[in-house]
Regions:
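Membrane-embedded alpha-helical bundles that constitute the cytochrome b-like, heme-associated redox core
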Residues: 1-207
Length: 207
């Protein structure tokens, strides 16, 4: 029974604990000993970068159109005005020059992605060279390596969406790599790209 004379915050926490039983979990988490060496914060840095990536990515999603359809650019950036380009590239240009805070969000997303990958690599290197991947933490190690692979795949997909020269070069290389796989390479490349390079579906699938 909650004391009615207790502060409102304590009464609210007691009410919440009676319904979801969170006190034990919170107490365990707060009592957990965390090493005081700075290198143990690199994993936390990756988590913060991931949070920033999610928030900025959601914002950018509202304005980006992952379509290879050719359009004529009529936006604010004069050097490209009147030139044909894909709708994906036009939406990226519009994000930089026409959408409020669009360029800031793009830059934050870009640098957060780079720092995210770098912090994962450094964190895994610390775990490896300190032997922290050994039993009983081998499952944590495998999860970390899997997350690194997924982060690299997502990073590749992200910069491939813009449909500029850099993304086109990367997609062409990836298409050739898939195509070189014996026996199933041709089938897999056609399945992923929706036909011969550049294909008509790859941008929407990456998105």
């Amino acid at each position: 029974v909650t004391d009615r004379g207790a502060p409102a915050t304590r009464r609210a926490l007691a009410w919440l604990d009676q319904r979801i039983g969170a006190a034990g979990f919170v107490r365990t988490a707060l009592n957990k000993v965390f090493p005081d060496h700075w290198s143990f914060m690199i994993g936390e840095l990756a988590l913060y970068c991931f949070t920033i990536l999610v928030l900025t990515g959601v914002y950018l999603t509202f304005f980006f159109h992952a379509s290879p359809t050719e359009v004529i650019y009529q936006g604010r950036y004069a050097p490209l005005r009147g030139l044909p380009m894909s709708e994906a590239y036009r939406s990226a240009i519009n994000l930089s020059f026409d959408v409020r805070a669009g360029l800031v969000m793009r830059q934050i997303h870009h640098w957060a992605a780079l720092l995210f990958l770098a912090s994962i690599v450094v964190h895994l290197a610390r775990v490896f060279f300190t032997g922290a991947f050994r039993r009983p933490r081998e499952i944590n190690w495998m999860i970390g390596v899997t997350l690194l692979v997924l982060a690299m795949i997502n990073g590749f997909a992200g910069y491939s969406l813009l449909d500029d020269q850099l993304s086109g070069t990367g997609l062409r290389i990836s298409y050739s790599i898939v195509l070189s796989i014996p026996v199933v390479g041709t089938w897999m490349a056609s399945l992923l790209f929706g036909g011969e390079f550049p294909g008509s579906d790859i941008l929407s699938r990456l998105f």
